[in-house]
């Protein structure tokens, strides 16, 4: 079986969804920009030699509809002979895109693929056109489709207080801002055209979603966003709404070395698991455990974790049940997470994997794990190994 390696990984800055940097930039353009950039950064690989493009996107309608993967590839002037497919596993879409490409390479059906994902939540809101079947309420709680209420449920089940959530949210912004100031994101962010507050076209090379002024005291003044009577989850402890894209160049190790391209990491194992939709945010726990089992590793072997921060109330129970509460500041989301950077649904899997690879290199660790919860009760995880 072929070894699957990540040769390169990049992302756009994360733009605010409401009147942000990418308010006049379409999702296809964000995607095409990264496709072009990956190919330009790795000229040893001819675009025509790509076997496929796998691109995650959740709200596949309006500008994100009709197979955005192919539309973006055409905009990027990728040769017409290269196919492209859009992948949807809700929040896990671009990580699923990575898994799909990895399996193709493992079986010898592909040698080189572009993978990634995008979501423009400003142009195509998360709730646009959603129409759940009324019969679902016979099988799952009605609130299972309301992500904020599932986070409230997890907080109550695991004893996660409002103060714990606010502290974690403040940490996310502080870590992300520190990473920005130190240049830690420089190796992953590709400057991307957008418009500033005055409408002037400029190149953005930073995440505008981060709020460096965030404090626990300020967060404590916010009202519950989903359960106004007894809730603890606020907008401040939830992932921000943002627009962005992320992309990776994935190859067989033999082809990468043949072309003189240096692999950054191997895909050591992959896992996807279902869970009760009412606690959809718990999915990273069984998914991570399965991925670790497949890799022949334990949580203690992992040097760095990237866990998508859908809600502080959601990620903290996952950290607790993976036995990592005492190692948060040493191993988990060291550059902040989605509470500060946002969670553009179809982009986030590739985004956290990209950030993870850079952290693994900076910290000089052998193994890293990226994982995320998925709406309606799933979890997805990937174990990476430095080459």
UniProtKB/Swiss-Prot annotation:
Principal localization reads: cytoplasm
- Quote the subcellular location field of this record: Cytoplasm
CDD domains to which the protein is assigned, alphabetical: thiolase
Q: What Pfam families does the entry give?
A: Thiolase_C (PF02803), Thiolase_N (PF00108)
User: What Gene Ontology cellular-component terms does the record carry?
Assistant: cytoplasm
Q: What EC designation does it have?
A: 2.3.1.16
Enzyme active site = 91 (acyl-thioester intermediate), 343 (proton acceptor), 373 (proton acceptor)
One GO-annotated biological process of the protein: fatty acid beta-oxidation
Gene3D superfamilies per UniProt: 3.40.47.10
Q: Does the keyword Mitochondrion apply?
A: no
Provide the family line.
Belongs to the thiolase-like superfamily. Thiolase family.
**Alphabetized UniProt keyword annotations:** Acyltransferase, Cytoplasm, Fatty acid metabolism, Lipid degradation, Lipid metabolism, Transferase
Pathway given for this chain reads: Lipid metabolism; fatty acid beta-oxidation
| Full protein name | 3-ketoacyl-CoA thiolase
Its biological purpose is as follows: Catalyzes the final step of fatty acid oxidation in which acetyl-CoA is released and the CoA ester of a fatty acid two carbons shorter is formed.
PROSITE patterns xrefs: THIOLASE_1, THIOLASE_2, THIOLASE_3
Single GO molecular-function term?
Answer: acetyl-CoA C-acyltransferase activity
Instruction: Check the record and name the HAMAP family matching this protein.
Output: FadA (MF_01620)
Which reactions appear under catalytic activity for this entry?
A: an acyl-CoA + acetyl-CoA = a 3-oxoacyl-CoA + CoA
Q: How does it assemble?
A: Heterotetramer of two alpha chains (FadB) and two beta chains (FadA).
